[in-house]
Design a protein with these regions (language model features):
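Bacterial N-terminal signal peptides that target proteins for export
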Residues: 3-18
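C-terminal motif of bacterial Sec signal peptides marking the signal peptidase cleavage site
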Residues: 26-28
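N-terminal "domain-start" segment that seeds a small globular fold
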Residues: 36-80, 106, 110
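Short active-site neighborhood of thiol/selenol oxidoreductases, capturing the structured segment around
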Residues: 79-109
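Structural microenvironment flanking redox-active thiols in thiol-disulfide oxidoreductases
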Residues: 100-156, 168-172
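Structural micro-motif
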Residues: 157-161, 176-186
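Thiol-/selenol-based redox modules, centered on thioredoxin-like
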Residues: 181-224
Length: 224
């Protein structure tokens, strides 16, 4: 009888200890979740939506073709260099303003994923990353890393140029400065004419990839 009582007491003790361990583990899991401060980093493509139905809302921008940007190798690139045989989708991100913008990396990820569809429509893409000074050039690497993570499937390169607008010269020429830059999208035809210009008022205020493809389809359907 004593042995039976002793065994029962031992079992209850082990069960109690197990319950304490499980409770501690669960509490640890709860604490390991993201804090409110980290929540912005968790915004993913599925959580971000851009506009399918948009109309041009901005002036074409004087001298847009001859704006000069710099790629990661230090080579100067102008929009003029990319037209002629192709249309051009020119996209301005917000740039580096103390953090990597999740909306910008998500949008650029969408351009990477849908680049084949854009290319099939006879078009090239140029993404501009504005920075205030040359010392911030390394932030482009951080931006691209965030973009590749969102793209998934082992993506490590972009199929189109991503360039720096050092000193916000292009941003100021187009009148799109706000903090750094307002989100802006320009579509140029093969002749260099701006056929669509959209400047957003917030980070999510951009034409969706669907809207861009629709604009490119319009160009493709034109005679000549």
């Amino acid at each position: 009888m004593f042995n039976a009582i002793s065994k029962a007491s031992s079992i209850r003790s082990r069960l109690g200890a197990t319950s304490v361990i499980v409770a501690a583990l669960l509490a640890g899991c709860a604490r390991s979740g993201p804090s409110v401060a980290d929540s912005a980093d968790l915004i993913g493509p599925a959580d971000i939506h851009f506009k399918d139905d948009v109309t041009a809302n901005a002036a074409p921008g004087d001298g847009l073709l001859d704006l000069s940007f710099v790629d990661q190798a230090g080579k100067a690139i102008k929009p003029r260099d990319l037209i002629g045989k192709k249309n051009l989708v020119l996209v301005f991100t917000r740039g580096y303003n103390g953090s990597i913008c999740p909306y910008c990396s998500s949008y650029t990820s969408g351009l990477i994923t849908n680049y084949p569809a854009i290319s099939q429509r006879g078009s090239e893409v140029l993404v501009v990353y504005p920075i205030t000074k040359p010392d911030h050039a390394q932030r482009l690497d951080e931006f691209l890393k965030a973009t590749f993570i969102r793209s998934g499937d082992g993506v490590t390169t972009t199929p189109f140029p991503v360039v720096l607008d050092i000193g916000l010269k292009g941003v100021d020429a187009l009148g799109i400065r706000k903090d750094l830059a307002k989100p802006a999208t320009y579509i140029l035809d093969k002749g260099g004419r701006v056929r669509f210009a959209y400047v957003g008022n917030s980070l999510s205020d951009r034409p969706s990839i669907k809207a861009i493809l629709k604009q490119l389809d319009t160009l493709r359907e034109e005679p000549g």
